[in-house]
Amino acid sequence: MRRIVTLAMLSLLSGAPCLAACHTDKFTFFYGSDTSTTMHVSSGGRCTLNIVLGPTGSIKSIAVTEQAKHGSASYNGGIAYPEIAYQSSRGYKGADAFAFTVDGQGIHRSGLSTIRVSVDVK
């Protein structure tokens, strides 16, 4: 059985439709392998990736390793309920990007994974 870590998106904009303000393409990765995804967010908006763990394994560390140029990315929530938040700069529309790493141990795999997030700011 392979250890899978899935990231799910939640919008933190109260009262706004989730897909209109913030949407992240679904993706899955294994510890020790890299992947990428795309986030769609409104100009000036905030989007959060909640890291959802499977029933086994553990996370050793999470860090934003490459900062966005037209917004900011941050790690919040600790190891128990980890999340990566992106806040776009108000008035900016266009492409942005950031990256973060997750280091952990699963049943069959362990290691550092880099997740690159391309951001489409509307």
Regions found by a protein language model. Name each.
Residues 1-4:
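Positively charged n-region of N-terminal signal peptides that target proteins for export
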Residues 7-15:
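Bacterial N-terminal signal peptides
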Residues 20-59, 107-122:
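Extracellular interdomain linkers/hinges and stalk-like, low-complexity segments
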Residues 43-83:
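Surface-exposed or secretory-pathway low-complexity segments enriched in glycine-proline
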Residues 83-93:
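Extracellular/luminal low-complexity segments enriched in Ser/Thr/Pro
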Residues 64, 75, 88, 119-121:
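Hydrophobic residues in beta-strands and at strand termini
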Residues 87, 101-103, 118:
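Residue-level recognition of well-ordered beta-strand positions that form the cores
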Residues 93-106:
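A short beta-strand micro-motif common to beta-rich folds, especially ectodomain repeats
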